[in-house]
């Protein structure tokens, strides 16, 4: 019997079935670097419309974690998608280099007794070393960017431009110095930014303290009662006993009703809505007698005695007082709370801060001098109890601000700091709304910004609406200095501040921040140096990263301002998004971005936060070593990043399965294009078979959908549709039907070349769709389609041929596919029963209604190819029904169809008539499939 296998057009490609991504990807990374792929992309994209995704700088400390990987992969997908969509989309990565974490690492290695200049030198070296480590991992992820020329906030030019932005903000009138309560970390020894504070549960002493009324006759008049000869106390409730030494007043709500109550402990004044709960707490509810009511406003100015210091404090009123808990009376210490500070300012209260940088009371403070605030708490409680001022004492578990670095409780303490005023109107600069405050400008800028997902707008608006002034000064060594000279007596800035800032900035451009630290004030001030102090403050690192729009976007010629997109984790609503917004509005009157995209945090497969203690941390390096970066990239794209991103070994295994389906499709496509040259074998769409035109219509429709999803950053929909297209539209339908034509038709026949034309366009479209996500696999596919020096990223979206009547074609074949699905169900039933093996062993009779019969009959003999059966007949009927029977015909040794004409040609034993025609005659005629 002849062997006809050699007469078939069998698939042939060096593209391997197994990806072996972990082994192969490093070779692609090396190739990209050797061939300067990023630079080549920039050259190819020159002159196109710009799309600028501005990189928020990760902190230069420690190995990258899975959250870093998510962030960089999302950015890379967008940049590559925009490049393929016809944009010039440069990507300049950056790093945040100053600040406390680096200081702590240097101290851990070298100790604390290091001269400041040497210490900063070590910090700079450490940051540079960390950047190189992180950079290698980011590159390994397949992220293309200007890695040889990133921006670093410690670069001299960047540091100098940071000072210039500070100067602009100072000139605009938004910067001021003041003693205000700020978040203070005792362990850091520095003020903290809002973004450096996180809330955790803490047990605190909750105490009710009575402030004795100093003028009982005055109180009687205000309550409109007869003379009072019994001691009276207004009772406050607090969870910070240590702040009582700094108390300057007791605040009531002006509109709340307050009650004068007679108890076994004397007369008490309590908010009416909280009276009952308070008396129960004190054990004084039994026998309590209500004497009178009045409003908080009527008690304003009433003098009270401090509970353990020999001084009087007034009653004040404020809208910040609530009736949620406590007594309706608030102990007010302007040096230890922002609300207290604000209301105290209206009354001219003293801003007293008896606590030092280390969290200890100054030695001169009565009772608690020299003690830490936490040690002072029990002593103050004991003192209050001994004096009869303590009415209740209990432990309260509540949410309390903690330092994000040390995980320790922080305090509010008033210090001399530099602030950017949220409610300052600033001076008209020609770019801002005249008379608008920074808060108003920021709110307007948020309104003009596009958000992905949309709920980010409300979140950022709420933060801007409620945030306090921005404390931008820090007491650190490794940071960009605030190069101001302040008058020793008045505290005023030197009148030449603008000029001096630029002189210092020019020096910093040459020598870095050391130029300021080493500066002798007399060099710049001359005789004035005797009257001015050189400030020792450094800038908040959020200011550093918040001015990248000026130091990077405006500075680098390949970029543009404003950026089209900022993309970071959802925590950056209170971090980089906000600091960039405020500095942008202060200098340019607008946000430095047109759109914001936020992604969620990574959690384990059970939705739990990752932590080393739980042992559920998944490192991106491990995933790349085990599965390859493309699997990590596919996982990121598969997940809806607007919420939490779940990852586990089980989830990754499912991603691998999805990848294999895509890879199998790619292998089939490439294997059947091995002898196809578009320059030689191209055909007009009119010459294609109908099912090929249908495949083109599906591809064109999907390309439009995917482009819309890419534009909306909806990557999980892209992956869903890509996998569905590969599995259902291609593998489960078109390619399955196509195998017979590709393998058995004459190699250069119209039928086969038409199929290859369709596959050529489909492959070129598919590889471009997937390349932003599966970048290494995309490049691997591209080597089979183009020269070795070429890259998929040097091209734009594939231009698919146009054709008329696509809507009708799609509708017609949707009906055919639905009918085919019914046939497949019946074939499977017969196969499971053991009557047939493959569907080619079956002969199908379709009993069809007139409309169905007309549709199926229009395919003529090609219907059997669509159904992948050896024979298909259509007969009229009142209802659609499928009948399947095993074929009694012989099996063709070449095409495996069961046909009555097998062995009809004695000179070609074992062949059916169409195989004889395809091999030795004019070839079979196909029109539809």
Swiss-Prot record:
This is Isoleucine--tRNA ligase. Belongs to the class-I aminoacyl-tRNA synthetase family. IleS type 1 subfamily. IleRS has two distinct active sites: one for aminoacylation and one for editing. The misactivated valine is translocated from the active site to the editing site, which sterically excludes the correctly activated isoleucine. The single editing site contains two valyl binding pockets, one specific for each substrate (Val-AMP or Val-tRNA(Ile)). Monomer. Disulfide bonds: none annotated. One of its GO terms (molecular function) is tRNA binding. One of its GO terms (cellular component) is cytosol. It catalyses: tRNA(Ile) + L-isoleucine + ATP = L-isoleucyl-tRNA(Ile) + AMP + diphosphate. Its cofactor is Zn(2+). Gene3D superfamilies: 1.10.730.20, HUPs (3.40.50.620), Valyl/Leucyl/Isoleucyl-tRNA synthetase, editing domain (3.90.740.10). Pfam families: Anticodon_1, tRNA-synt_1, zf-FPG_IleRS. Its EC number is 6.1.1.5. Catalyzes the attachment of isoleucine to tRNA(Ile). As IleRS can inadvertently accommodate and process structurally similar amino acids such as valine, to avoid such errors it has two additional distinct tRNA(Ile)-dependent editing activities. One activity is designated as 'pretransfer' editing and involves the hydrolysis of activated Val-AMP. The other activity is designated 'posttransfer' editing and involves deacylation of mischarged Val-tRNA(Ile). ATP binds at residue 612. Keywords: Aminoacyl-tRNA synthetase, ATP-binding, Cytoplasm, Ligase, Metal-binding, Nucleotide-binding, Protein biosynthesis, Zinc.
